[in-house]
A protein has these predicted regions:
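Structural signature of the two symmetry-related core transmembrane helices
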Residues: 79-93, 269-283
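A late C-terminal transmembrane helix in Major Facilitator Superfamily
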Residues: 324-354
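C-terminal membrane-cytosol helix-exit motif in multi-pass small-molecule transporters
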Residues: 173-191, 373-378
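Loop-to-transmembrane helix entry/capping segments in MFS-fold secondary transporters
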Residues: 47-48, 131-141, 238, 322-332
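Cytoplasmic helix-loop-helix junction between adjacent transmembrane helices
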Residues: 108-143
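Helix-loop boundary and gating motifs at the non-cytosolic
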Residues: 8-53, 58, 216-233
Length: 397
């Protein structure tokens, strides 16, 4: 009976997390990628101010994830989680009516909402005590992220063929409503001894931060400027320029699905491979001959996008206790928000000076530095790199 109850509980967590992940991440990606287009094309912002409007979203996400969420108990976090999902319905409506002034307020509120949602959803996906089940659920969560990032851009790609950017926000409201209903059933940790003491010094968190740096610096730039780069370089329409996201996230989904089916106990070789692909693709950006070649490069970048995030979250789950995990995930997401806040701003400025192609080449520098530092500090850490033996998928459930 206990085994049956455990299976029912596991299935319940899988369903609620996957549905919540789709609602949250599909709309989050839409807001992050469409707001710059609305600012640039409808409101005539410069590249620099396009970078700033994107920074506003991540600034408010950072404030919540880094300073507020780690200090809240699980009961209050759950109430705010539900409230944030409800608030997003009104945020999408406000984007539809936004002008050059109100778009800043809409972006700030969106950042606050996602700041409470993202770290708590990651924590909910890592509650299980059994390591194999926990890492399988983390992989399923990552698969849900990628699936939402395929269906979301696919829907937006179709919508942009029939409506302008403002109406896209309206069409995503039903997905947010589903997320609001699902948020009522998401499980939160019930431990009474949650702590954030010394979490910033935790090796699992620090290794995860270095790992995510190897990819999220270029991805922070791509998530904001990919469509604008495609329009500028290849002179394609807005809907066509948006289409590389679909191929990109499809490869990411395939990568995460394979990691779910055949998880590795050691992540050394997959991590090295992912960092190498990122560096290779960035070095080829100045030499892209046509739009088809651009799509191929984006598909290659989908591999590290699929692998780096789940590897980072697995590092946190291996290196922290349940009592530390909310704070660790909050600080981890806060760090990501810093990257997505600073990189677009700097990248937007650099683009205005040296152009898109050379700007992407500059992104190689932090990728290489963070990768080298990661393996120098943690390359022999057996908690993260115990060997290359695979964990049997059949025994993970």
């Amino acid at each position: 009976m206990r085994i049956k109850n455990n299976n029912v509980n596991y299935i319940y967590m899988v369903i609620t997390i996957l549905v919540m992940t789709f609602s949250m991440r599909a709309t989050n990606n839409m807001v992050i990628t469409t707001t710059p287009l609305l600012a640039k094309i409808d409101l005539h912002f410069s590249e620099f101010y396009v970078g700033i409007i994107s920074t506003v979203i991540y600034l408010f996400m950072f404030v919540v994830t880094f300073y507020i969420n780690p200090r809240l108990n699980h009961k209050l976090r759950k109430k705010l989680f539900i409230t944030a999902n409800a608030a997003l319905i009104f945020v999408l409506l406000s984007y539809f009516f936004a002008d050059a002034i109100t778009i800043w307020l809409s972006s700030a509120i969106a950042g606050l909402a996602y700041g409470i949602m993202l770290p708590n959803l990651i924590t909910s996906s890592s509650l299980l005590k059994d390591q194999k089940q926990r890492e399988r659920l983390i992989s399923l969560y990552s698969v849900g992220l990628s699936l939402s990032l395929i269906l979301g851009p696919s829907i937006e790609y179709y919508l942009l063929t029939i409506v302008d950017y403002r109406y896209v926000f309206l069409f995503f409201i039903p997905a947010v409503f589903v997320g609001f209903i699902t948020s009522l059933f998401i499980k939160f940790p019930e431990t009474k001894n949650e702590t954030r003491k010394n979490v910033l010094k935790n090796d699992g968190l620090k290794a995860a931060m270095l790992t995510i740096t190897t990819y999220n610096i270029p991805f922070a730039a791509l998530s904001i400027f990919l469509t604008l780069f495609a329009i500028s370089r290849f002179h394609v329409s807005g809907s066509v320029a948006y289409s590389p996201y679909i191929y990109f996230f499809s490869v990411s989904l395939a990568t995460r699905f394979m990691m779910m089916l055949r998880p590795f106990k050691s992540i050394r070789l997959p991590l090295i491979f992912s960092i190498a692909i990122t560096g290779l693709v960035l070095s080829l950006f100045p030499f892209i001959p046509d739009f088809t070649a651009f799509i191929v490069l984006m598909m290659l970048l989908g591999i590290p996008h699929g692998s780096i995030f789940p590897i980072s979250t697995i590092m946190i789950s291996r290196g922290t206790t349940l009592e530390q995990r909310n704070a660790a995930n909050s600080y981890f997401m806060g760090y990501n928000n810093i990257l997505f806040m600073i990189v677009p701003l700097i990248f937007g400025y650099i683009v205005g000076v040296i152009g898109y192609e050379n700007s992407f080449l500059v992104l190689l520098i932090p990728v290489v530095i963070s990768g080298i530092y990661l393996f120098k500090i943690y390359g022999e850490n057996k908690m993260f790199f115990p060997g290359n033996k695979k964990i049997s998928a059949s025994k993970s459930l």
